[in-house]
Structures are given as structure tokens and as C-alpha cells.
């Protein structure tokens, strides 16, 4: 814009409620304020994508990660089905404050789900856990419904093998 390179996406006001997807180019290096990307400002967003070639953030299945790694950077607030990249450990607050989230798919290769990994997801119905998970903390779910199904094995989707 006018000779300036935009490298940060920081919202001062909430996005309109009809915005369902965000797409970030290779120039974007950060979202929102440190530690709270877009928090409370993008409540209708269901998916977020990053252009290939961005060295600082990447996306997969509508979720943004740090670099090309497995550390979650931003999960859209209105996402309903979350497929996480394989990560050794799903730590505290990896998934939090997602009011519309109904399903979580943990990818094969993940071994540990720590306490409070999934927090404040009031619509959560089920979590698919692969065979590779050998430790799932009894308090991994916090402020989530008491009747969340934990399904070990298949996701029921032909292209996702666990």
C-alpha cells in the first residue's frame, strides 16, 4: 500500500459477521497481538489460509501454525471440525475458547494429550484419538461437556487413516 509493506494483520475492530475465511499472503508475519492472534475480532471465521512460501506461518485444514511446524498459532473461532497436524504432545490450551467446535481429530503421530489441552469448547461432541496416543490425561478436557465421546481409531472418513 503506497510503498509500505504490510507484515502484520492486527484488527482494531471486529470483522463483519459474513467473513468466513481469511487468506494471508507471503508478506504477513504476525496476526493480532502477541499470544492472542485475532482474539475476539474474527468470531465468524471458519477457516484461515496462508500462501505457500510464507516462511513464518503456514496453514493446514484451515488452521494456522508457526512456520512449517506443528505449533498451533491460530484456530478460527467458528471452526466446527478441527484436524490437528501430527504433534508429539498436545499441551495445555492448544485448543481453547472455540464455542462452535464439535469435533477434534488428533492425527497419527501424536503420543500425549496433556491436562487442559482442550478448554472452553461448549459444543464439543467427539474427539478422534489415533492408536499412537499412549497418554490422554483425565483432565485433558476442561470446561467442555461431560458427555464428549473419545473415539480411539478410525475417524469414519475414508481419506483419514488413524
Where are the regions a protein language model picked out?
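Structural signature of tandem-repeat unit edges
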Residues: 1-32, 40-62, 73-89, 98-112, ...
